[in-house]
From Swiss-Prot:
Protein name: UvrABC system protein C
Segments forming a coiled coil: none
Residues covered by the UVR domain: 196-231
Cytoplasm in keyword set: yes
One annotated GO biological process: SOS response
Gene Ontology cellular-component annotations: cytoplasm; excinuclease repair complex
Length: 590
């Protein structure tokens, strides 16, 4: 804990509000709310914490707080601050998933569409549906039952839907506004839960057609009834009151929280939503934040009623969302809550099993690697590899592994600038110098371990630059390969010595993954550069083809092979004069 934080902790008030944790770059990394700011914020810097909370605390270099007049005001402010800053440790709804809706468009001749975007365009929206397949199946059923227009744009003649009796063909025939209004009202009634009434009406029409010996017509009605049953009645009836409601329950353990949401539509459980995230404070407070974000971020429509557990502040949710909130004590609604809680508990159990397996491959591996190398646990590993063919187009690449996993946003590619010919040692010196000069200049995080895909010479070159030029003390190890180009040994120390690792150990497998990844990244970059060089060379010396036109041709065709397949006319279409295009075609065919 630094001096600035100590001084600020002493000034925290006994009032509700929000706090913003910041890292060394002054970036907001976590936002929280508290009933009493002094108690909540101080708790982060006292006592023991689990590993993930300790990781958060270790990154905090400063914090700010905003006092509010009430808990509900703090909750609303917290939601807005999370939206504004998108902190990396507020991960509960990062996917920002949107659900599909069925829309009746507001047009002269309306149509049905499935969409994830709800706009203020006077169209009628129904949903949300649990997935796009459910929405499409329902739309397909409605298309069979109600002959609204199907085409995005009205064609010049009738289409197949007209001949199937599924469209009135407003493209050719006059369809009145009254007819369209009646159809949209019928669809609206159906989507609002009136499909049982529609089914009864179809059954009556089927019976009437059968009595009148109109057997083909009766068969059509029978098929429509079957479509309704197969599409709308797959789910078991959960509640008989036909009220749309969302059921929330949660479970927490070992610093993680799982929230399960059951979507009840027209009395049926149609789908669920599962969210799992790290827990940094009391579960009931985290749940309040979750439920506020759930309806503000995920494009969810508020149902008529929400069911929540007894442990939750019901009044605060009602004030926040302006919706009817229930905490049932018995009966079918209570059973739904218990079922959601059971699912949340099972999901956490499954999560922990997967975490344990994953941690053995990642966190467990880096901890064992640190012990084997006699260094601190290398949470951040940066690995380097060179690539060239007899000194042409020399490049280097760096990959980053955080907590034993690749962090591709931080991968870097380097064109070698100061070295000529096949000089791996000189190339490594240049790249290490460029990388860590920038790290020092921009105050970026230093790695806990640097891995060099190479032997003693390259490791020594890297160490010389780090220690003697930049004054850095970072462990450097070399990844040595055997005759079959497989990870064989690890070099570290001064003087460099081989560290033996069990070949079937997780730390050895981790090194293999890192070595394979940095090699893949370097090779792919080198091939990319060679492809560009080959492309440039075949165009050299052609009159009228300068750097700009080379870039244009490369961007359009992508490779020499594809450009050789092009005609002068194809090249001319790029805005290149025909005469120049013909010269290019001739040069490529030589």
């Amino acid at each position: 804990m630094n001096k600035k934080i100590k001084e600020k902790l002493a000034l925290l008030p006994d009032q509700p509000g929000c706090y913003l944790m910041k890292d060394r770059q002054d970036t907001v990394i976590y936002v929280g709310k508290a009933k009493i700011l002094k108690n909540r914020v101080r708790s982060y810097f006292s006592g023991s914490h689990d590993a993930k909370t300790q990781r958060l605390v270790s990154e905090i270099e400063d914090f700010e707080y905003i006092v509010t007049s009430s808990n509900i005001e703090a909750l609303i402010l917290e939601m807005n601050l999370i939206k504004k800053y998108d902190p990396k440790y507020n991960v509960m709804l990062k996917d920002d998933k949107s659900y599909p809706f069925i829309k009746i468009t507001n047009e002269r001749h309306p149509k049905l569409v499935v969409t994830r975007k709800v706009k203020k365009d006077k169209g009628r929206y129904f949903g949300p549906y649990p997935n796009v397949q459910a929405a499409r199946e329902t739309k397909k059923l409605l298309d069979r039952l109600y002959p609204l227009r199907k085409c995005a744009k009205l064609p010049d003649r009738v289409c197949l839907y007209y001949h199937l009796g599924q469209c009135l063909a407003p493209c050719v025939y006059d369809v009145s506004e009254e007819t369209n209004r009646q159809l949209t009202e019928e669809i609206t009634r159906f989507l609002k839960g009136g499909y049982n009434e529609v089914k009864k009406e179809l059954e009556a029409k089927m019976l009437e057609a059968s009595e009148n010996l109109q057997f083909e017509r009766a068969k059509e009605f029978r098929d429509q009834i079957a479509h309704i049953e197969s599409t709308m009645e797959k789910q078991k009836m959960m509640l008989n009151d036909m009220v749309d409601r969302d059921v929330f329950a949660y479970s927490y353990d070992k610093g993680w929280m799982c929230v399960q949401v059951f979507f009840i539509r027209q009395g049926k459980l149609i789908e669920r939503d599962v969210s799992m995230f790290p827990l940094y404070r009391e579960a009931d407070e985290e749940f309040l934040t979750f439920i506020g974000q759930f309806y503000s971020k995920n494009n969810h429509f508020l149902p008529k009623e929400i069911l929540v557990p007894d442990s939750v502040d019901k009044d605060m949710i009602e004030e926040l969302l302006d919706v009817n909130v229930r905490q049932p004590k018995r009966g079918a609604k209570k059973d739904l809550l218990l079922l959601a809680h059971k699912n949340a508990k099972l999901a956490l159990k499954e999560k922990f099993s997967l975490i344990e397996r994953d941690e053995e491959r990642t966190i467990g591996a880096i901890e064992k690697l640190g012990k084997a190398l006699d260094i601190y646990t290398p949470y951040r590993i940066e690995a380097f590899d060179n690539s060239n063919i007899q000194g042409t187009d020399p490049v280097s690449a760096m990959v980053v592994f955080l907590d034993g996993k690749p962090h591709k946003k931080e991968y870097r590619k380097y064109k070698i600038k100061t070295v000529e010919g096949p000089d791996d040692y000189g190339s490594m010196r240049e790249v290490i110098r460029r990388r860590y000069t920038r790290v020092l200049k921009e105050n970026l995080p230093l790695p806990d371990l640097i891995l060099i895909d190479g032997g003693k010479g390259q490791v020594s070159a890297a160490l010389d630059v780090l220690e003697n030029e930049l004054g850095l003390d970072v462990p450097v190890a070399g990844l040595v390969k055997d005759d079959k180009h497989r990870t064989s040994n690890l070099l570290i120390g001064d003087p460099l010595e081989i560290v033996q690792l069990e070949r079937n150990s997780q730390e050895f497998y981790l090194l293999q993954r890192i070595q394979d990844e940095v090699h893949r990244f370097a090779i792919s970059f080198h091939r990319q550069l060679r492809g560009k060089s080959a492309f440039q060379s075949v165009l050299d010396g052609i009159p009228g083809v300068g750097e700009q036109r080379k870039k244009l041709l490369l961007k359009h065709f992508g490779s020499v092979k594809k450009m050789k397949e092009a005609s002068a006319e194809d090249i001319r279409k790029l805005g290149i004069p025909l005469k120049t295009a013909q010269l290019i075609e001739e040069a490529l065919k030589k």
